[in-house]
Amino acid sequence: FFFTVSLSVQSANAGNITINLGHGNTEGSAYDPLAKKFAELAEKYSNGSLKVKVRCCAQLVKEDEAFKAMQLGTVDMAIITGNNLSPHFGLTDAFVLPYIFQNKEHAYKVLEGPVGDSYKKKLLDATGITILAFGFVGDRDFYNSRKPIKSMADMKGLKVRVPKNQVMIDTFKEFGAAPIALPWADTPTALQTGT
C-alpha cells in the first residue's frame, strides 16, 4: 500500500488542525492499526496541535476514488494500494507487476531506497501528492464461492475480483481467469451474489 497525504502549506501552519485519514478496509483490518498508530504519533509529536481522525470502511471515499479526492482537496490523507494509485500516475504500475519483488524484504529495500525516493519525488512533482510511507499488508490470496484453487488450471474461466488496474486485469486474463474490475468495498456483496 501507499500511505499518501495532501495537505496545503497554509493548513499545516495554521496551528491546531484536525485532518481526516481514510481507508477502505474495515475497522481492525490491516490498514486500521497503521492509521490509528499514525494518529497517535501525529498528536504526540505535534504536542497535541495535530489531531487525526481515522475513517475506516470507505466513510470518506472509496479507495479507488481517494487519490483524486486528495488532489481536489476533499480528502486530507488516505491509505491506497498501488493498484488504485496507478490510474492517476502510471509509473506506479512498475510496482504492481506480479512477482516484481522476491519477498517483503526485497520490496522494502527497493521502495525505501533510491528507487522509492525517485518515485516519490516524481509523484509529488506530477500530482501534488506526497507518499509518507510504503507498506505491505499481505500476500495476494484467492477466494471464491465456486471451487478450491489448487493449480493454475483451476483459474480457467473463474470470475475473479481485481482492482480497476490494467496490469491486474491483464495478469488474471493470462492466468486463465475472467477478471472483473470491482472496488474492494463491493467484494463481499459480489461473493454473496456470485457476480
Where does each model-flagged region fall?
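Bacterial N-terminal signal peptides
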Residues: 1-6
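Short, polar/charged alpha-helical segment
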Residues: 28-53, 167-170
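Extracytoplasmic small-molecule ligand-binding "clamshell" domains
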Residues: 37, 44-45, 51-71, 76, ...
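Short helix-initiation/N-cap motifs at beta->coil->alpha
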Residues: 55-68, 164-167, 180-193
